């Protein structure tokens, strides 16, 4: 095997499967090395190179971990960007330009004599795949930084002006992103029956996400110009919503995907549910990786729990709001699951939950607030206490969806509602279909809502007046919970402050310093104590004296668990500038030293 391919294969793991690795540093390649010309002359070798780019989709636990430290999922440690004191001086990250270089390098080779032995069809397909990855990477960076320099070629080592050009308007960058994704949509011929590789539908999905994000980010954050004050001229908000709707509609009309009947199977099956999953990560029980074991993951680095404020947004099974029910605010943990959206009990532990044949209440030592996640967890692997000596050898074998059809339906519904084009037919096709799959009944499946839900409006979206948009946002929260979109959704909806202000509240408990039977089965389960002398033998004893951040608060005659962190560690700036990362001051200084300008984002 030639030297170049050895370099590639030593870094690109798992071949044509989802690699989830850092790809090779193509800047190391020397065109004069023996065998260099062979790398891009073989379709197999080129595909190996492209497979190294799949790490850009994240690890199999990326979605789960990305939703930590949001409004509905507390954490001990938050992103530096959302801590008080974050500034251009403390910022250290500025783009992922090594990845952009790699994409451009491969594109350069595919358009050169190095790829002369490839057929025109092979070359076109490979170029389309690489442009998909470049478009996705730039879209990710637009979300993080806004304006960016655009590079569509390999920079010469002596091209100092090119290397140090200032950022261009995000409006211009989005035009380039959509050009890349449109090329991928029109030219990718590769298919992926097991949903582990990019395809035309993956490109459409990325276009849908990018346009929906950009439209709502501009609308709800009142962003109309670049950091330098240049007005956007390529796309209006309406243009972007329309593009998002069109991309989603193409996937819908393609007829390749539909909703699976068993929602939980999406997250527990060994093989990806390709009826609904557009792109996913295939895993295996005998390969130790970051997904193994999801139950271990949910028990480490407490607190790992949903909040009660968010759990309250799950509807009743008949499609009516739980928060319209008299006395909902003081419901016990046992009672609040009664007649609820079935997805609630499939997302968190519920009264009567069992593993290994034994009833199990939430593990409050890890899930402080009582809503312990089980969405991705194989229940038979739930015992991570060490009591089972063989447990250490058990690993999750369930694969993980990355992009799925339900999100397409929700994006289509949102874009149509924002455009003022929502009707009963679209509602039934999208939100209604998702709720029906979940087991919800009633008119909310077929009729566009007309009554604003005051709980959603008060606790989450005070500036939204459309009942339909509120319900679509409810449905995104419930359906896509712990799938890695929450932070992005809040920021694009102009609700970033919820990352700081949303209460991290938990279940209601009857009393402290006494043993409690949470699930009503006649056996005491836990004692929440403020006085260590009040611990009770034979139950889980959980301190609520603030020593771990966990306390109790009065809630209409009951006690409610609350998790608190230092306010400086959970911060949102009043001027809203945290919608974007800072450009590190050291980068700006380095440009200035060489006589160039690198524009900072507003507020820093």
Tell where the protein language model's regions lie, with residue ranges.
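Flexible, polar/acidic helix-loop-strand segments at domain edges
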Residues: 331-405, 598-604
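Short coil/turn linking the two alpha-helices of tandem helical-hairpin repeats
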Residues: 142-144, 149, 192, 213-222, ...
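Conserved, well-structured interaction surfaces
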Residues: 43, 47-48, 76-145, 159-197, ...
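Bacterial Sec-dependent N-terminal signal peptides
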Residues: 2-8, 13, 18-44, 177, ...
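Membrane-proximal, proline-rich intrinsically disordered regions
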Residues: 24-65, 318, 322-323, 331, ...
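Long, intrinsically disordered, low-complexity segments
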Residues: 23-26, 96-99, 176, 253, ...
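Extended ligand-binding clefts on enzyme/binding-domain cores
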Residues: 253, 257-369, 468
């Amino acid at each position: 095997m030639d030297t170049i391919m050895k370099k590639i294969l030593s870094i690109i793991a798992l071949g044509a499967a989802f690699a989830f690795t850092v790809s090779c540093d193509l800047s190391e390649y020397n065109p004069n090395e023996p065998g260099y010309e062979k790398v891009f002359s073989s379709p197999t070798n080129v595909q190996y190179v492209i497979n190294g780019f799949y790490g850009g989709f994240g690890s199999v636990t990326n979605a789960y971990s990305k939703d930590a430290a949001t409004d509905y999922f507390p954490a001990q440690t938050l992103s530096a960007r959302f801590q008080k004191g974050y500034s251009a001086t403390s910022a250290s990250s500025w783009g992922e330009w090594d990845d952009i270089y790699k994409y451009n390098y491969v594109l350069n080779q595919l358009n050169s004599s190095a790829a002369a032995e490839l057929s025109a069809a092979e070359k076109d397909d490979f170029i389309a795949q690489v442009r998909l990855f470049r478009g996705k990477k730039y879209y990710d960076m637009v979300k993080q930084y806004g304006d960016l320099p655009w590079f569509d070629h390999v920079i010469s080592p002596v091209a100092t002006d090119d290397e140090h050009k200032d950022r261009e308007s995000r409006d211009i960058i989005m035009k380039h992103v959509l050009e890349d994704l449109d090329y991928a949509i029109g030219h990718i011929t590769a298919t992926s029956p097991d949903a582990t590789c990019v395809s035309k539908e993956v490109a459409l999905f990325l276009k849908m996400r990018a346009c929906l994000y950009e439209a709502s980010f501009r609308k709800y954050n009142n962003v109309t110009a670049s950091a330098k004050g240049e007005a956007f001229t390529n796309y209006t908000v309406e243009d972007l919503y329309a593009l998002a709707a069109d991309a989603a509609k193409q996937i819908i009309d393609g007829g390749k995907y539909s909703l699976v009947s068993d929602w939980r199977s999406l997250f527990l099956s060994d093989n990806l549910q390709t009826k609904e999953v557009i792109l996913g990560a295939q895993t295996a029980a005998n390969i130790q990786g970051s997904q193994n074991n999801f139950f271990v993951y949910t028990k480490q680095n407490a607190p790992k729990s949903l909040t009660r404020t968010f759990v309250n947004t799950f509807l009743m099974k008949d499609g009516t709001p739980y928060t319209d029910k008299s006395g909902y605010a003081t419901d016990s943990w046992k009672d609040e699951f009664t007649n609820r959206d079935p997805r609630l009990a499939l997302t968190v532990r519920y009264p009567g939950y069992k593993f290994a044949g034994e009833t199990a209440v939430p593990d409050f030592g890890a899930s402080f607030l009582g809503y312990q996640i089980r969405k991705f967890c194989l229940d038979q692997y739930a015992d991570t206490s060490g009591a089972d000596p063989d447990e250490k050898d058990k690993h999750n074998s369930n694969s993980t969806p990355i992009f799925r059809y339900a999100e397409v339906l929700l994006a289509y519904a949102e874009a149509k509602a924002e455009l003022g084009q929502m009707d009963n037919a679209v509602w039934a096709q999208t939100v209604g279909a998702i709720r029906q799959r979940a087991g919800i009944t009633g008119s909310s499946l077929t009729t566009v809502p007309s009554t604003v839900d005051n709980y959603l409006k008060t606790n989450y979206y005070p500036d939204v007046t459309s009942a339909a948009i509120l319900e679509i946002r409810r449905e995104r929260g419930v359906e896509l919970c712990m799938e890695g979109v929450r932070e992005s959704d809040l920021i694009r909806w102009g609700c970033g402050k919820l990352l700081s202000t949303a209460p991290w509240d938990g279940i209601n408990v009857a009393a402290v310093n006494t043993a409690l039977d949470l699930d009503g089965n006649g056996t005491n389960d836990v004692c929440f104590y403020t006085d260590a002398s009040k611990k009770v033998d034979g139950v889980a004893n959980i301190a609520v004296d603030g020593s771990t951040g966990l306390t109790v608060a009065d809630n209409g005659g009951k006690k409610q668990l609350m998790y608190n962190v230092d306010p400086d560690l959970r911060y949102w700036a009043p001027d809203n500038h945290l919608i974007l990362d800072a450009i590190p001051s050291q980068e700006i200084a380095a440009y200035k030293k060489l006589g160039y300008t690198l524009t900072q984002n507003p507020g820093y």
